Amino acid sequence: RFPFVEIHPRDACAAGVIDGGFARIETDFGQCVLKVIVTDRQQPGMLFVPIHWSDETSSSARVGALVAPHVDPYSGQPENKATPVALSPCDYPQHGFALSRDVLSFPESVWWTRVAVTGGYGYLLASKRDVQWQAWFNEGCSEHDIAEYLDGAGGIYRAASFNGDRLTRCLFVEPSDRTSDWDIIKALFAVETVNAEQRRLLLSGKALDGIASVGPIVCACFGVGRNTICDALKSGAARSHLDLGTQLKAG
């Protein structure tokens, strides 16, 4: 899941940020770039941001760096809830994702966050149009077979690398108003080998025979999707939240 900031609709309107977009949050001590959730469950004049992400798991979501270094004189607890912030929209016209068997390093201007996937590392991405994605991908996969799809005018780039019959890395980048089903690609990434038909259809982003979409991620720690949870409930394999935790590790 994306690192996010929750904001009241009235404050979102005043700041010029929209639900599903990105916002830059700045204080005298640091800044973050986060996905925006506009909701009336948040109090006007207040923001909510989880503290789960670090520099190892996201490019710009370390909330602790924003907080004023004031502590309670007795308990030593930080004054996390009283730091003034400035909020402004941050535009990323391209979104995408990457999967790799190894940890990836992205161009400095790319916004990224790491997500748990089976068999390697998953990343959700956002960027400006000037990032040279094709050059970046080819530089990191020079020793493997590479398949590519490029639509320069449409701002679409998709690529996959293979070591024999094993998918080793893939990248999907497209305009922010389009959404490829990365659940399908994650499922294919989890298997040991891909057949010729799966390899041919991989860059289409469409459903592949024998590979089911897990749906939107509900449990980020173990990469458990909504479809997986619903299937377990419908089949009777799980009848309670305790069953889901035991079988799927979903919290």
Show which residues each predicted segment covers.
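General structural feature for long, well-ordered alpha-helical segments within catalytic domains
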Residues: 8, 32, 225-228, 240
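Glycine-centered helix-boundary capping/hinge motifs
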Residues: 16-20, 223, 249
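Alpha-helical residues within the helix-turn-helix
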Residues: 246
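Long, contiguous, secondary-structure-rich segments that constitute the structural scaffold
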Residues: 1-6, 10-153, 161-162
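Helix-rich C-terminal "cap"/substrate-channel and partner-interaction subdomain
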Residues: 100-238, 250-251
